[in-house]
Amino acid sequence: RRQRQMCIRDSFWQVPEAKIGSPFRAKKLNGEIFESENKDSLFSAYSGEAKERLTYPQAARWLVFLNNYDDTAAKKKAKDRTLPSMGPGWLGRLGVVYVKGANLFDTLMRNLMFLRDGGKLWEEDAPCWELDAARTEERTEVPCPDNFAGLMTMQYRRILLKRQEGWVTGCTVLGGDFFDSTNAFAEPMTLWNKKEESKNNPRYYYPRVHSMSKQLWREFSALTGIDSHVPGVIWWNTLLQNEKILSRKEHLQICALGVEYGKMSNSMTDCYTDQLSMELALLNELGRAWQSRVEDEVENCEQAAQCVGRLAWELSLAAGDKNDTTAESARTQFYFTIDQPFRLWLQSIDPETDKL
């Protein structure tokens, strides 16, 4: 009974001090009708009062979404101190990748890394609600979490839901916690970019977002770490195979998702999803030679696409058409044509038995 009373009384993942934050209607909270720069919502999944309110279970789910993918529309409230730029929510700044299993339990185990940063044990779990002192100030820089629960529950936004007659009708939002994304390898579910060493700066890595116009196989080198840092969940699954927890013939389904923000990141303008299937061994030491072969073929496709685009542009120009989008349209059609054949070829590779 006491637990039930606590659930009713306490506010899930909310911060009372956020009541001074930027006010938003329920549409801001609901990711299914998350507002873009387009003011008219066409073919919306909600209409009438349903757009202006949420049930408590709905609000709890979308609270997690807003914390991780919020744009930068919320304004700074503190007047007496200089605050850093907020930036989008943490997941909105990542090129998210995760491994899809045969069922929910399998998926969770494939992505629940017991080691961080390529080998070290996580520190003792400390979710945000178990900190010695709750963080309530806006836009607070903190160290990169050293425990998995801390990473998964970090409050990138301070949010307080508005309730009326058993419904959630809106929220107020402040900027929350953030950490330096440079070499933040505690984050296991992202692609990485590499910044080469310069005269005054050592080499470092930072999260790589997905290109909205690129199929996932075109980012193959980022999955393997050939030219960058291998995503943590990919490394984890290859480790499970090396330890014989997963079979040598294990097939891997990699899912990717991401979002794109508009000017100044004030609104979300597009979203990205893709999936890719291949033998897990292709991403392991056993598949090193094949990794180079696949990357060569990706590069060959890129060069062919450039040639197709150039040819289309020259033919269009010869016909008197000076449309600047001709080349890009031809490249897009080229990739659409080869997309499925390339995926099927990648899926069919068995690095243990197939010859290069």
Whereabouts are the PLM-identified features?
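Beta-strand elements of modular eukaryotic interaction domains
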Residues: F43-A45
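Short functional micro-motifs and their immediate structural scaffolds
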Residues: A60-L63
